[in-house]
């Protein structure tokens, strides 16, 4: 991807498997950790991944701390409504990104992609699902911004068969852009030819 001239969005899930609003399970290696240990583990892992990708010349143009965090991360400690813990974990990831970026700009990381020379700051995105649900975004980001580190972008998932109409998405984006003063990105989207849930078609035969 880097050789082709594209930037890379580094998406950190903080789980042994894909994480989304229905499953935000801690890695097995972290299962016995308390809140402070989880916070440190997020920081250490994020910094390690930043070093790994930067040292191997990957053109990181954005970092996503967690995936679809609508219901939190690192359950059960970081499950909504435990916003103090959610903020602690997300903040740890953001701080690690900032630390690695400081090292990149200082020239202390070798092998950094030349395409990143003009990038003054690697932006951080926080990503929720259900892009048409304004109440969700207000509740989540109202709570996080009282406790959280600074970040640059809000990411939204939008699947119309789950997340409402385009008008609902537009209204939500207009509201949160003004309310939080962040850039927005639709991080996941699928516009199918039907509004029916595809789960109805997953089992086509009895065999």
Please tell me what each predicted stretch does:
Residues 1-3, 7:
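N-terminal carbohydrate-binding/catalytic regions of secreted carbohydrate-active enzymes
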Residues 3, 119, 179-181:
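Short, well-ordered coil/turn elements that cap or connect secondary structure elements
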Residues 8-12, 61-65, 124-126, 152-156, ...:
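Hydrophobic faces of well-ordered beta-strands that scaffold small-molecule active sites
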Residues 12-18, 66-68, 190-191:
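Short glycine-enriched loops at secondary-structure junctions
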Residues 20-145, 149-151, 164-175, 202-204:
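Active-site cleft segment of glycoside hydrolase catalytic domains centered on the general acid/base Glu
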Residues 102, 146-150, 156-159, 178-185:
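Short helix-capping and hinge/turn segments at secondary-structure transitions, especially at repeat
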Residues 130-133, 159-163, 190-194:
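Short, catalytically relevant binding-site loops at active-site mouths
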Residues 170-207:
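Surface-exposed substrate-engagement region within the catalytic domains
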């Amino acid at each position: 991807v880097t050789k082709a001239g594209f930037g890379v969005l580094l998406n950190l899930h903080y789980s042994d498997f894909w994480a989304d609003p229905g499953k935000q399970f801690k890695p097995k290696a972290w299962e016995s950790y308390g809140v402070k240990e989880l916070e440190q583990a997020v920081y250490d892992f994020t910094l390690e991944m930043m070093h790994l990708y930067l040292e191997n010349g990957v053109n990181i143009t954005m970092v996503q701390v967690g995936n679809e965090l609508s219901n939190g991360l690192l359950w059960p400690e970081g499950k909504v409504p435990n916003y103090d813990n959610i903020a602690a974990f997300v903040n740890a990831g953001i701080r690690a990104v900032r630390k690695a970026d400081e090292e990149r700009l200082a020239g202390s990381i070798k092998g950094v992609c030349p395409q990143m020379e003009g990038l003054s700051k690697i932006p951080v995105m926080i990503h929720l699902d259900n892009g048409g649900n304004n109440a969700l975004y207000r509740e989540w980001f109202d709570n996080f911004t009282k406790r959280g580190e600074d970040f640059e972008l809000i990411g939204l998932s939008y699947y119309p068969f789950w997340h409402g109409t385009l008008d609902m998405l537009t209204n939500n984006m207009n509201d949160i852009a003004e309310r939080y003063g962040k850039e927005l990105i639709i991080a996941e989207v699928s516009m199918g030819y039907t509004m029916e849930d595809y789960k109805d078609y997953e089992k086509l035969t009895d065999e």
